[in-house]
Regions:
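Serine endopeptidase catalytic core focused on the charge-relay Asp
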Residues: 46-155, 178-179
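A short beta-strand motif characteristic of beta-propeller blades
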Residues: 42-44
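Short, solvent-exposed secondary-structure boundary/capping segments
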Residues: 102-105, 158-166
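Catalytic nucleophile loop of clan PA
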Residues: 166-187
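Short beta->alpha transition motifs characteristic of CBS
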Residues: 70-75, 184-191
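C-terminal cap/linker of serine protease catalytic domains
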Residues: 108-121, 190-223
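Cleaved targeting-peptide boundary
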Residues: 31-37
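Secretory targeting and sorting signals
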Residues: 1-31
Length: 223
């Protein structure tokens, strides 16, 4: 099923079925042998029924192992499984979901996850400013994998960047990068998948909101 998102002056159709964010886990436990590998671009299952993509994984100022995904993928308390290893059980929980900026925070269990900074063809080393026209941006999604395209920029100054990049259901939350710099996430497409523009929230807006709110996600830095 699609989520319908209002993006600026257009109706945007959500590109995924669910969400994934936040898992529980205390202290500095080490991942066990064979723990699911999770990073920006990993597929996740929310509440054992919906699929989305992890934007990034890292630590916040409180030392928690946290990640991001699209806000329409789930609500606080939603359980998260690894798509590649459902047998590993619940690996995290959504702890916060912001429907205005359409992002969510997941707290992962450090004893059940192996966090990495590279999935597929995307490596994330830092978080940066929004993409500007005519930059080329790329994403790594659990459905369509690695695709790239021309960024049009934040056309309506709404903390969302438009890009000509193929995304479909399940890609929601996918990291959008320039090189190894994370600049945004995938949230929606306009009109027709892989033909209409992709629309996604800027990472700068997400980071600013997490820092202002405090708690899980504040002071975030990628693995």
């Amino acid at each position: 099923m699609f989520n319908t998102l209002v993006r600026a002056a257009h109706a945007a159709f959500a590109v995924a079925l669910g969400a994934a964010l936040l898992g529980t886990g205390a202290g500095v436990a080490q991942a066990g042998p064979g723990s699911p590998v999770i990073g920006g671009g990993s597929g996740i299952i929310i509440d054992n029924q919906f699929e989305c993509t992890v934007t990034t994984i890292g630590h916040d100022a409180g030392g928690r192992l946290v990640g991001l995904t699209a806000g329409h993928c789930g609500e606080a308390g939603s359980e998260v499984w690894s798509e590649q290893d459902r047998g590993a059980g619940v690996i995290g929980h959504f702890v916060y979901s912001n429907h205005d900026l359409d992002y969510a925070v997941i707290q992962f269990d450090p004893g059940h996850v192996t966090p990495v900074n590279r999935i597929g063809n995307v490596t994330i080393t830092n978080v940066g400013a929004p993409a500007q026209f005519p930059s080329i941006v790329c994403k790594e999604g659990r459905t369509t994998g690695n695709t790239c395209g021309l960024a049009f920029g934040d056309i309506f100054q709404t903390d969302e960047t438009w890009a000509e990049m193929c995304v479909v259901e399940g890609d929601s939350g996918a990291p959008v990068v320039i090189g190894t710099t994370l600049v945004g996430m995938v949230n929606a497409y306009l009109a027709v998948a892989c033909f209409g523009p992709e629309v996604g929230t800027n990472m700068s807006a997400i980071v600013n909101d997490m820092n202002a709110r405090g708690g899980a996600g504040a002071g975030y830095a990628p693995i």
